């Protein structure tokens, strides 16, 4: 009897163990299936995103087709389409219609930028522009004389930068760029390429600030595809995480993480001084004032010597063009009157239209965007004075023209404070 009881107990335990083992197997099988499903979904989404955003082959095919038909011409055309000396590298695109790739052109490292669209919007920004479109490479038309093309360029630039005493000099600069083979003549294909490029803020800025150290040099173009020199370190700060991880990290923690991966403080101070110098260059510059409407870290980078470079100038817009576009913008509240990331005006509620004057100058928005970057790691004896000056800078209101003396005083005080601190250090 005892033996029977023992057998039944042993069988019961064996059955219980087998049932538990089956449950564990099913559980792990389900978890394995779930992991495979999630991984496959992530890979699919990443691949779909990549194929949607990264269309370099399509861009090259369109440009080279136009070049082979004699519609466009430019200094980069033969290297891109005939000699295969201009190579597309890593995709950096964030929007399907604005292709950005690292590139190699002979012994030069560059960044290739190409607009993928059947129609090209005048570039103040699609969200602000009236519905004004041109078919790409339609202008100038066959039979247009060089003198007529010059008038077209002058009229367009006047609308962008306003009436300038030296507008003719800017027109001459544009025509010099248009003459890509430097033979002293502008062909119709060269003129079509130049006209398409002239609609882009970044190209206009590159011409206006050519020779200045804080904007990448324009290396060449073909149609509306253009190549600028590559900036070694970009974005200015922060880390790039896979988007599933990025979704789960709180915004405050993300900002702190971004500040962990930055150069030493003297080098950060030198980079910030470069930003102040860039603001000086575009405030009452040779060809008018410009507004920097995206002060995020992704818009900037720096060289191996820690000199600041503007890496994305699409949201740097001539102040005159900004004003003209804003007064055409309808609004219901102040939030409707924003261009780019941070250029704001107010809403005239009685007229339901945005006002023309920007709420804060470039300097105030730069100080606000870079405050945490600059204060983190600052020498203890400097922190109080630096913070005080940064907050005074952030308090600037209205356009720089309205408070020119205060603007210049704050900018020079910040530069002096930082240079005095880092001028004797090897890091700077």
UniProtKB/Swiss-Prot annotation:
The keyword Transport does not apply. It is a single-pass type II membrane protein. InterPro entries: FAM69_kinase_dom, FAM69_N. One of its GO terms (cellular component) is endoplasmic reticulum membrane. It is found in: Endoplasmic reticulum membrane. Residues 1-27 are cytoplasmic. Its main location: endoplasmic reticulum. It holds the Pfam family PIP49_C. Keywords: Disulfide bond, Endoplasmic reticulum, Membrane, Signal-anchor, Transmembrane, Transmembrane helix. Coiled coil: none annotated. Residues 49-428 are lumenal. The chain crosses the membrane at residues 28-48. Among the many cysteines in the lumenal domain, most are probably involved in disulfide bonds. The keyword NAD does not apply. PANTHER family: DIVERGENT PROTEIN KINASE DOMAIN 1A, DIVERGENT PROTEIN KINASE DOMAIN 1C-RELATED. Belongs to the DIPK family. This is Divergent protein kinase domain 1A. It comes from Danio rerio. The gene is dipk1a.
């Amino acid at each position: 009897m005892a033996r029977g009881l023992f057998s039944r107990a042993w069988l019961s335990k064996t059955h219980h163990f087998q049932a538990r083992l089956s449950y564990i197997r099913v559980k792990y099988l389900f978890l394995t299936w779930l992991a495979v499903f999630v991984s496959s979904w992530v890979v699919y989404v990443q691949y779909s995103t990549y194929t949607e955003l990264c269309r370099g082959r399509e861009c090259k095919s369109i440009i080279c087709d136009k070049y082979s038909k004699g519609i466009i011409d430019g200094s980069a055309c033969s290297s891109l389409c005939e000699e295969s000396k201009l190579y597309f590298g890593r995709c950096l695109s964030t929007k399907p219609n604005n292709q950005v790739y690292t590139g190699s052109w002979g012994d030069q490292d560059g960044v290739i930028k190409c607009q993928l669209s059947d129609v090209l919007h005048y570039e103040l920004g699609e969200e602000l522009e009236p519905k004004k479109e041109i078919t790409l490479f339609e202008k100038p038309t066959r039979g247009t004389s060089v003198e007529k093309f010059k008038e077209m360029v002058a009229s367009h630039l006047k609308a962008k930068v306003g009436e300038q005493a030296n507008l003719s000099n800017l027109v001459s600069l544009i025509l010099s760029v248009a003459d890509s083979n430097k033979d002293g003549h502008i062909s119709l294909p060269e003129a079509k390429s130049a006209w398409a490029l002239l609609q882009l803020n970044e190209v206009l800025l590159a011409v206006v600030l050519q020779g200045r150290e804080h904007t990448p040099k324009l290396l060449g173009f073909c149609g509306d595809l253009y190549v600028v020199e590559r900036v070694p370190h970009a974005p200015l700060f922060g880390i790039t995480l896979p988007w599933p991880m990025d979704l789960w990290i709180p915004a405050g923690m993300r900002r702190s993480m971004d500040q962990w991966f930055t150069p030493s403080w003297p080098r950060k101070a030198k980079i910030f001084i470069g930003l102040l110098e860039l603001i000086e260059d575009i405030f009452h510059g040779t060809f008018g004032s410009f507004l920097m409407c995206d002060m995020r870290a992704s818009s900037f980078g720096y060289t191996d010597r820690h000199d600041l470079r503007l890496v994305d100038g699409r949201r740097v817009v001539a102040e005159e063009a900004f004003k003209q576009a804003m007064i055409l913008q309808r609004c219901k509240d102040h939030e409707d009157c924003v261009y780019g990331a941070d250029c704001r005006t107010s809403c005239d509620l009685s007229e339901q239209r945005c006002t023309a004057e920007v709420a804060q100058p470039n300097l105030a928005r730069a100080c606000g965007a870079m405050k945490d970057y600059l204060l983190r790691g600052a020498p203890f004896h400097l922190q109080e004075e630096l913070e005080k000056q940064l907050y005074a800078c952030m308090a600037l209101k209205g356009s720089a023209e309205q408070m020119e003396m205060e603007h210049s005083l704050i900018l020079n005080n910040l530069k002096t404070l930082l240079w005095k601190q880092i001028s004797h250090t090897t890091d700077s």
